[in-house]
Swiss-Prot record:
Entry-linked NCBIfam families: PRK11898.1
Gene Ontology cellular component list: cytoplasm
Any Pfam family matching the protein: PDT
The Prephenate dehydratase domain, residue ranges: 4-179
Matching CDD domains: ACT_CM-PDT, PBP2_PDT_like
Name under which the protein is recorded: Prephenate dehydratase
An example molecular function term from Gene Ontology annotations: prephenate dehydratase activity
pH effects: Optimum pH is 5-10.
GO biological process: L-phenylalanine biosynthetic process
Position of the signal peptide: none
Location of the ACT domain: 194-269
Temperature note: Thermostable.
């Protein structure tokens, strides 16, 4: 029986595109499958599948739900990463007849200036692909969708304007999650992701964490705080850093002195 790599519906999203790219790197007989939400992906993966979920957008920031679930599902690890260029397109029937534009909230936010210039109303839906589907099924010329070229092709709609995003360096990082995987090859770049809680909330507490990395010449690629969900004003921290095989065990051991817990979320290759 084929094993599955799972992403979130609907079809035609960047999540599907990222899943297909990961499939090119994975060694083994895998099929693509899908479910309804990021949480559902984690649940399916917990039963020995693989999953692909977004974790960070260069414009809108991190995907909080993905970060929370990486902490909640402790047996699931980050196995790989890739980034996709995100280009938004106006999709529909006739640009001059559009009154309302629909899309995912992040896509609407990333095209705010373009939408404002045209004076259109906006409506948020759960995904860019769902927006394109709504426009296709409604056959309403006053509706436009913001979505990908793949979605437009899938639903046989026109691309009325290309690359309408406000910022042209728009990228989204996707991660492959699961318990284990074998890749066809290993790229040069590797990352490590951890999450931890500081032992004491006092001046300089985070400095001592960062100092451990600086003393070992380990480069951080991301640091971010999230509410601990224990009480207001308490936080946990997520850090990504470039993998240093010789110093990895040493740095993790050194961080234990300053933290109440530290979880290794994954050691993984970064694919182009």
């Amino acid at each position: 029986m084929n094993k599955a790599v799972i992403y979130t519906l609907p079809k035609g999203t960047y999540s599907e595109k990222a899943t297909k790219k990961f499939l090119d790197y994975i060694d083994g007989d895998y099929k693509i499958d899908y479910c309804n939400s990021i949480y559902d992906v984690f649940e399916r993966v917990d039963n020995n599948g693989l999953g692909v979920v977004p974790i960070e957008n260069s414009i809108e920031g991190s995907v909080s739900l993905t970060q929370d679930l990486l902490l909640q599902f402790k047996d699931i690890k980050i196995l790989g990463e890739l980034a996709l260029d995100i280009h938004h397109n106006l999709i529909g029937y006739d640009k001059n007849k559009i009154k309302t534009v629909i899309s995912h909230p992040q896509a609407l936010a990333q095209c705010r200036n373009y939408i404002k210039k045209h004076g259109w109303d906006v409506k948020a839906v759960e995904s860019t692909a769902k927006a394109v589907k709504i426009v296709a099924e409604s056959k309403d010329e006053t509706l436009g969708a913001i979505g990908s070229k793949e979605s437009a092709e899938h639903y046989n709609l026109k691309i009325l304007d290309e690359n309408i995003e406000d910022y042209k360096n728009n990228k989204t990082r996707f991660i492959l999650i699961g318990k284990k995987v074998k890749f066809k090859y290993h790229p040069k770049n590797y990352k490590v992701s951890i999450v931890f809680e500081l032992k004491e909330d006092k001046p300089g507490a985070l400095y001592h964490i960062l100092k451990e990395f600086a003393e070992r010449n380990i480069n951080l690629t991301r640091i971010e705080s999230r509410p601990s969900k224990k009480r207001l004003g308490t936080y946990i921290f997520y850090i990504d850093f470039e993998n240093n095989k010789e110093k990895l065990e040493e740095i993790l051991k050194s961080l234990e002195r300053h933290t109440t817990f530290i979880n290794l979320l994954g050691k993984y290759p970064v694919f182009d």
